[in-house]
């Protein structure tokens, strides 16, 4: 899976699944931009990966729900790396659990702004470059919640990930003629700092263990590679068997 000299953007990459994805890509020889709303954490992650793997990394602060910030972030990466071959839209947040009728429009706007519109903004910013090169990989972060509705009292999160799911398939058809693949991964119960208090248990999974960020990162590594050149429009389940289709 030679990715030497290629460059990637990974959003929400300062910790958890995003950081594991960034680590996988730098281990494969990629230059990686760590994009995160937390500047200090992004710098720390970029420096850690550079020191550990001798990688060419950079940290970019960005609130993915703000289109202007996304455009500025993409421009910074293009100025530094000269290209972006792989976009991993990983940034996301969970929704608070409460009765459906108690969710406000602000709640819906916040979750959709980060979990869905962030993907839209980064795709819009990078698609022209990828179309011109007739090459590229776009990998979005869906969730098994898009299929199951998620755990009780989390409708906004599930709906936002269902939107990512559908956009991925639609965009794959549009980008096919340009040799740009568009796929998504749909993690199940993955243990991260963000999900630590979500109530996940080993006995919820047929394989009797919770997933790790590396379980997700290794699949993303494949989708980012030349080995996946004829794979597009796919939602890849990473859930230990909790959802089978």
Regions found by a protein language model. Name each.
Residues 83, 176, 181, 231-233, ...:
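Short, small/polar-rich loop/turn modules that mediate ligand/substrate recognition or access, typified
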Residues 98-100, 107-112, 201-202:
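Substrate-binding pocket helix/loop in short-chain dehydrogenase/reductase
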Residues 103, 149-158, 170:
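Active-site loop-to-helix junction immediately N-terminal to the catalytic Tyr of the SDR YXXXK motif
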Residues 123, 160, 168:
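Active-site helix of classical SDR
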